[in-house]
Amino acid sequence: MIQMQTNLEVADNSGARRVQCIKVLGGAGRRFASVGDIIVVSVKEAIPRGRVKKGDVHRAVIVRTAKEIRREDGSCIRFDRNAAVLINKQGEPIGTRIFGPVTRELRAKKYMKIISLAPEVL
């Protein structure tokens, strides 16, 4: 469950290390976002010579949350930290690699590029 001011780690090699959610997209007054939702983020920490710089504003799709996700079969899945992948306006990832596992829920939201780059889909 991600809301405004939430800090997330970046799960790709775009150059950002840590981002902060500044807006949850999808409807007026929408407060929370979960796995597969798009948010607007500000880069708070970045590596030198990366594709993105500190202070840049980008869109991101959430790939892991600390709040558990209920599945249709009744099972739950949760992670230690919140993580996101930076995307451009067309919905394609800015980075070329994804670090760590991603959830199956991304397949239903049509993020096939992120799923194909991920080392593990849970």
UniProtKB/Swiss-Prot annotation:
Any one cellular-component term (Gene Ontology): cytosolic large ribosomal subunit
UniProt keyword RNA-binding, yes or no: yes
SMART domains in the record: Ribosomal_L14
Keywords: Ribonucleoprotein, Ribosomal protein, RNA-binding, rRNA-binding
One GO biological process term: translation
Any Pfam family matching the protein: Ribosomal_L14
Regions crossing the membrane: none
The protein's assembly and partners: Part of the 50S ribosomal subunit. Forms a cluster with proteins L3 and L19. In the 70S ribosome, L14 and L19 interact and together make contacts with the 16S rRNA in bridges B5 and B8.
Similarity-based family: Belongs to the universal ribosomal protein uL14 family.
Protein name: Large ribosomal subunit protein uL14
Taxonomic source organism: Rhodospirillum centenum (strain ATCC 51521 / SW)
Taxonomic classification: Bacteria, Pseudomonadati, Pseudomonadota, Alphaproteobacteria, Rhodospirillales
Encoding gene per record: rplN
